[in-house]
A protein has these predicted regions:
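Phosphate-end processing signature that detects enzymes handling 5′-triphosphorylated RNA
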Residues: 1-130
């Protein structure tokens, strides 16, 4: 996470390992009365290092291993964190008019955390626990 420069805008950078190479991204999330929207763009390693100089020192990098998969056309992501041996966060991409996703076989859903501030990346960056 980067130090805020505008009210209602959260900025962050991300390094993602993809095979033997790294990809870098800059993201802004804007909050308005109508809701929130996020824009993300790829950046160079040099830009990533420059943005690191703007890091919010009250927060930590959120390290995780992300698993992506599809079942019956439904996309899922599971984030596994080194600071939690017993819990992970699963996300399902839902089409606009879709109902709740089917739980993949072999996965136990402990509870629904959509919208729960305790499971937002910004909180994980602050406290490093689930």
């Amino acid at each position: 996470y980067l130090v805020g420069t505008q009210p209602n805008v959260v900025r962050r950078i991300r390094q993602q390992k993809n095979g033997q190479e790294y990809l870098y991204f800059y993201t802004e999330k804007r909050y308005t009365d109508a809701g929130a929207w996020e824009t993300e763009k790829p950046i160079t390693q040099k830009e990533y290092v420059q943005y690191l100089m703007e890091a919010d020192t009250a927060l930590h990098a959120v390290h995780k291993t992300k698993y992506r998969f599809c079942i019956d056309g439904q996309r899922f992501e599971i984030d596994v964190y080194p600071f939690s041996e017993s819990r992970a966060i699963m996300r399902a991409e839902l089409p606009a008019a879709a109902s709740a996703p089917q739980t993949p076989q072999g996965i136990e859903i402990i509870r629904e955390v959509t919208g729960d501030p305790m499971y937002k990346n910004s909180r994980l960056a602050r406290e490093q626990k689930l």
